[in-house]
Amino acid sequence: MCKLFINAKSEMWASHTRSLRIDGMVTSVRLEDYFWRTIDEIAARDGMTAPQMLTRLYHESIDAGHDLGNFTSFLRVCCLRYMHLQLDGYIPRDKSVALGDLNAEKILAGESRIYH
């Protein structure tokens, strides 16, 4: 079992920092390359760049009343949820399907039945 993880390309867990501007303030986010690739994929599905999506995600999270004391951890969980929702069949693996076109309420209801 461990060989599957140990022998993966080490570039996947190499960390990289990207800077983005949120409300006029420059902030840096440091994530492993595998998470950045996932964020790029999520953003592209809705016709956005990663900085555009992260800014939007930040604002919508604040508007929803979330405490984003650790935005980087929040992003990692978002990436993992995205992949799990694909595996569970709630998000199509077809990258041409925009996430914004999906029925979020239905997906969240299905997810809550699985991960309660």
Positions of PLM-derived features:
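Charged interaction scaffolds used for protein-protein
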Residues: 112-116
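Short, positively charged interaction helices/loops
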Residues: 64-110
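Short Lys/Arg-rich basic patches
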Residues: 4-30
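Amphipathic, hydrophobic secondary-structure cores in small proteins
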Residues: 22, 28-74, 79
